[in-house]
Amino acid sequence: MKKGIFLYLSLLALSLSAQDNIQWRGTDRTGIYHETGLLKSWPENGPVLLWHYDGLGEGHSSVAIDSEKIYITGLTEGQGYIYVFDMNGKLLKKKEYGPDWNTNYIGPRGTVTVNEGKIYLISGLGDIYCFDQDNLNAVWKKSLLQEYNASNTEWGICEAPLIIDEKIIATPGGKEHNMVALNKNTGELIWSSPGEGDLSAYCSPLYISDQQVPIIVTMTADHIIGVNASTGEKLWSHENKNRYSVHANTPVYSNRMILCTSGYGRGSTMLRLTNGGKSIEQVWFSAELDNRIGSMVKVGDYAYGSGDSKRYWFCVDWNTGEIKFKEQGLAMGNIISDDAMLYCYTDRGDMALAKATPEKFDVVSKFPVTMGTEQHWAHPVIYKGVLYVRHGNTLMAYKVK
């Protein structure tokens, strides 16, 4: 009996682990990964490079991992491709899906989402795709901008599809059809929300399921909005403007509190859900905490990230907004966390490992990412003791356990 229980728990743990990275920034889009026994420091030249692949084409999307396969996108000569690798870096499949963003900072932006045998993708041109996971054949495709009378953004749509039960959520940014829920199997419209009628703002939405109503939270050009995930009803909004209408960071949620952060002259806003999620109140605001595109992570009672205007790395008390430290030394960048450590990938190409402590920005190791092309913007991913880093044309896998 004990052996049976142990086997069941072991299989369950493996199953949960295999599902950890099927979408943008992990299981629940928090950037928090759930492994143990990871290295607390790295050799001077960085952790062991297990493998790398140099033929992705351009792009800024991260990997998604499901059933021991790695999925990522890239752009070559104006055409977008999905790549599938095994865990040893062997290319299993490569399939063209159509044109993608080729105007500025070219290449796919949004990370794919894997769900129940399908792969979902929103291109920089605003096309939403559903592919069969096994053969990568297209199941359906919709043009979000054409079908919902929306305009593209200056730097291309950047959104990772959000799956909720039978629905796939996207933010075309139209006046009438600001956010939509489509049937994930057919692409047909389930509901449409006018939101505040803003343009889309490069934000991948967050799903909150522990309130009286299920809520989708995202940032559009001038607002933070909360939408009823079942009906599309706009529950609330909060004005949130910055210089270029860029709000690229997925909100962070914990215990009724939502942290939304943006650069370009904005900062961080902490909202609290009230009335079972049907309304909000502002808890605190800080103009100093102005993360541009690197996201933030919550570890314990503190949030960590980097700033835009002054290039600080900072720690803030989640509940009060008190800044615990703001330190320079690394260029600004993106951040994930695992096993009480912070993984900071800067836009100058340094990968740093720091302790998640409010006392100081304690960087214990770092190394330069020398392979790859163009901007260092793709967010890293951790899966089964391996750190996956994408730099333009190159995908790298480092052993961190």
Located regions from the model:
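Bacterial Sec-dependent N-terminal signal peptides
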Residues: 1-20
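Blade/loop signatures of beta-propeller domains
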Residues: 19-48, 269
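Short loop/turn segments immediately following the C-termini of beta-strands
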Residues: 26-29, 75-77, 124, 173-174, ...
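Extracytoplasmic beta-rich repeat domains
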Residues: 50-64, 94-113, 141-163, 176, ...
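Short coil/turn segments that connect the beta-strands within blades of beta-propeller domains
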Residues: 67-68, 116-117, 165-166, 212-214, ...
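Short loop/turn segments that connect beta-strands within beta-propeller blades
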Residues: 86-90, 132-136, 183-186, 228-232, ...
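Loop/turn-rich, solvent-exposed surfaces of beta-rich toroidal or solenoidal domains
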Residues: 266-267, 288-356
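Blade-level signature of beta-propeller repeat domains, shared across WD40, Kelch, NHL, RCC1
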Residues: 373-401
